[in-house]
């Protein structure tokens, strides 16, 4: 009879489920992981959104480089002049609000809504460094006001 009673007790204790402490531990672990993962994901999405702005400058970068190869001064290179594409304002892309060329530099302004918090209203500036001779390529210096700046921008 004692073996039957101990077997019944073992079955009852095995079928009880999780204790409150175990559930609280799981909730605490999920909370800690979320506290780390959410900010990292926002930085990741912010960098991806900035990449759109940098990618959209490629046509203007090529046109500015061609003009610089002819010996033109940086101050004479503006959006819509010569072979430079015109400036774009008011929704240039999904995350980009405007793109302006001024004195050879390309300034991209990100949107103020619908973007990651670390990108809201940020600007990306790509400034050309003219080559010493026409045979060399134009290099570009990137700077941004975004908190989650990409590795290519200082």
Model-derived features with residue positions:
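N-terminal leader/signal peptides at the extreme start of proteins
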Residues: 1-21
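Short alpha-helical segments used as structural interaction elements across diverse proteins
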Residues: 6-9, 13, 39, 44, ...
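A short, glycine- and basic residue-enriched loop/turn
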Residues: 15-21, 30, 47-48, 57
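Alpha-helical hydrophobic helix detector
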Residues: 24-40
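Contiguous, function-dense segments enriched for cysteine-driven chemistry
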Residues: 26, 45, 100
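Residue-level signature of catalytic and energy-coupling elements of molecular machines
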Residues: 31, 60, 126
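Conserved hydrophobic/amphipathic alpha-helical signal-anchor segments
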Residues: 35, 43-85
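Periplasmic/extracellular, small/polar-rich flexible segments of pilin-like filament-forming proteins
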Residues: 68-154
């Amino acid at each position: 009879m004692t073996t039957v009673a101990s077997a019944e007790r073992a079955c009852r204790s095995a079928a009880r489920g999780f204790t409150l402490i175990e559930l609280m531990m799981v909730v605490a672990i999920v909370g800690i992981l979320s506290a780390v993962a959410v900010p990292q994901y926002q930085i990741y999405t912010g960098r991806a959104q900035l990449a759109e702005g940098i990618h959209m400058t490629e046509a203007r970068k090529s046109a500015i480089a061609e003009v610089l190869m002819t010996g033109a001064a940086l101050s004479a290179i503006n959006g819509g002049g010569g072979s430079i594409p015109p400036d774009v304002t008011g929704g240039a892309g999904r995350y980009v609000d405007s793109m302006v060329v001024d004195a050879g530099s390309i300034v991209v302004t990100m949107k103020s809504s619908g973007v990651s918090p670390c990108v809201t209203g940020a600007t990306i500036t790509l400034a050309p460094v003219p080559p010493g001779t026409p045979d060399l390529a134009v290099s570009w210096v990137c700077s941004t006001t975004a908190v989650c700046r990409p590795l290519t921008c200082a």
